[in-house]
Curated annotation (Swiss-Prot):
Native species: Homo sapiens (Human)
Glycosylated residues in this chain: N81, N97, N144
Positions of the propeptide removed during maturation: 22-168
Keywords associated with the record: Aortic aneurysm, Copper, Disease variant, Disulfide bond, Glycoprotein, LTQ, Metal-binding, Oxidoreductase, Secreted, Signal, Sulfation, TPQ
Cross-link type Lysine tyrosylquinone (Lys-Tyr), residue numbers: K320-Y355
Cofactors demanded by this protein: Cu cation; lysine tyrosylquinone residue
The family this protein is said to belong to: Belongs to the lysyl oxidase family.
GO biological processes: ascending aorta development; blood vessel morphogenesis; bone mineralization; cell chemotaxis; cellular response to chemokine; collagen fibril organization; connective tissue development; descending aorta development
Gene that this polypeptide is encoded by: LOX
Tissue specificity as recorded in UniProt: Heart, placenta, skeletal muscle, kidney, lung and pancreas.
Sulfotyrosine: residues bearing it: Y187
Annotated spans, Lysyl-oxidase like: 213-417
Keyword presence, Transmembrane helix: no
Name this polypeptide is given: Protein-lysine 6-oxidase
Disorder cited: Aortic aneurysm, familial thoracic 10: A form of thoracic aortic aneurysm, a disease characterized by permanent dilation of the thoracic aorta usually due to degenerative changes in the aortic wall. It is primarily associated with a characteristic histologic appearance known as 'medial necrosis' or 'Erdheim cystic medial necrosis' in which there is degeneration and fragmentation of elastic fibers, loss of smooth muscle cells, and an accumulation of basophilic ground substance.
């Protein structure tokens, strides 16, 4: 029984040995064996220097060859083996250095140079760079010929810069930074700048002026909210410090509970020019008013007069109003860039400097004025301290009917005088 199991196990093994060890047939030829390849030589891959010591990283592996395009003009039948034997170098460029001269060769010149090996074109690439634009830019640089009115091709990696502007001078640039005020050139995210080659009329900052400002007072704003109010001298102490009352309010016999009659009216001035309206006084000479807690940047921004309707004679002393200039509001598409601070004061193009009728010094003291018909004259930039493109729209005249207790304004218009 044990012998039978041994025969069954050794039988297949002997059969396999006979099959593998049998000599090949006469018609079959065994391919010759190639000698083993010699081990690759050590090649230097990376070398660097640190603290005066040179380090090298050696490897037996093959050198990495990045993928590159084959020049269409160099594709010649039968040249595959020759090109495979040529050493390849890593691609380290970012543009295509092929010139346009190869494209404009004549048939004769191409025939002469057919036997010469053409240099392999190196293709330079970078993320975000267009290959077609790179070829066009390379061709224009190689030809070195540009039409008189033609602008050379520019890379799309960097937009063209303006020559007449300064760096960071665009008021619509969201990354513009100013050490004076973080809200200077404030960029409104809800109002994107319109694309186009021309700048909008609001372009202009303190560094780069585009034309001149043009102040215009709103006559309808004055007419809508003119009224009479009585206030005690106790509540007018801050206004008295800024000389906002009539001369009779500064007499020695005036007491705190005495009342003054005030003709109140609002004012809204718009800069419809193409440049910023900046204060006439330099920043170091601005006056700080502790009572109102702000700086006055102009000696006389507005002037108020009450004239007799028949004789045009002044019946109430005019008031010099030196305000804190700022962009209270702006038209759609324009942005606030000035605030009533110690650093930035002014009026941007397309913006308004608004003063309500309830603030201090926005009035004329009419305590000594009798009832009758008068003319309210409001002048903006009356002394022409700041240059403007048009001075004929700086005055507003309104007809005032004063009853002794109430005042009614009508017929407010812009006047040249």
């Amino acid at each position: 029984m044990r012998f039978a199991w041994t025969v069954l196990l050794l039988g297949p093994l002997q059969l396999c040995a006979l099959v593998h060890c049998a000599p090949p047939a006469a018609g079959q030829q065994q391919p010759p064996r190639e000698p083993p390849a010699a081990p690759g030589a050590w090649r230097q891959q990376i070398q660097w220097e640190n603290n005066g010591q040179v380090f090298s990283l050696l490897s037996l592996g093959s050198q990495y060859q990045p993928q590159r395009r084959r020049d269409p003009g160099a594709a010649v039948p039968g040249a595959a083996n020759a090109s495979a034997q040529q050493p390849r170098t890593p691609i380290l460029l970012i543009r295509d250095n092929r010139t346009a001269a190869a494209r404009t060769r004549t048939a004769g010149s191409s025939g002469v140079t057919a036997g010469r090996p053409r240099p392999t074109a190196r293709h330079w690439f970078q993320a975000g760079y267009s290959t077609s634009r790179a070829r066009e830019a390379g061709a224009s640089r190689a030809e070195n010929q540009t039409a008189p009115g033609e602008v050379p091709a520019l890379s799309n990696l960097r937009p063209p810069s303006r020559v007449d502007g300064m760096v960071g001078d665009d008021p619509y640039n969201p990354y513009k930074y100013s050490d004076d005020n973080p809200y200077y050139n404030y960029y409104d995210t809800y109002e994107r700048p319109r694309p186009g080659g021309r700048y909008r009329p609001g372009y202009g900052t303190g560094y780069f002026q585009y034309g001149l400002p043009d102040l215009v007072a709103d006559p309808y704003y004055i007419q809508a909210s003119t009224y009479v109010q009585k206030m005690s001298m106790y509540n007018l102490r801050c206004a008295a410090e800024e000389n906002c009352l009539a001369s009779t309010a500064y007499r020695a016999d005036v007491r705190d509970y005495d009342h003054r009659v005030l003709l109140r009216f609002p004012q809204r001035v718009k800069n419809q020019g193409t440049s910023d309206f900046l204060p006439s006084r330099p920043r170091y000479s601005w006056e700080w008013h502790s009572c109102h807690q702000h700086y006055h940047s102009m000696d006389e921004f507005s002037h108020y007069d009450l004239l007799d309707a028949n004789t045009q004679r002044r019946v109430a002393e005019g008031h010099k109003a030196s305000f804190c200039l700022e962009d209270t509001s702006c038209d759609y598409g324009y942005h606030r860039r000035f605030a009533c601070t110690a650093h930035t004061q002014g009026l941007s193009p397309g913006c308004y400097d608004t003063y309500g009728a309830d603030i201090d010094c926005q009035w004329i003291d009419i305590t000594d004025v009798k009832p009758g018909n008068y003319i309210l004259k409001v002048s903006v930039n009356p002394s022409y301290l700041v240059p403007e493109s048009d001075y004929t729209n700086n005055v507003v005249r309104c007809d005032i009917r004063y009853t002794g207790h109430h005042a009614y304004a009508s017929g407010c218009t812009i006047s040249p005088y």
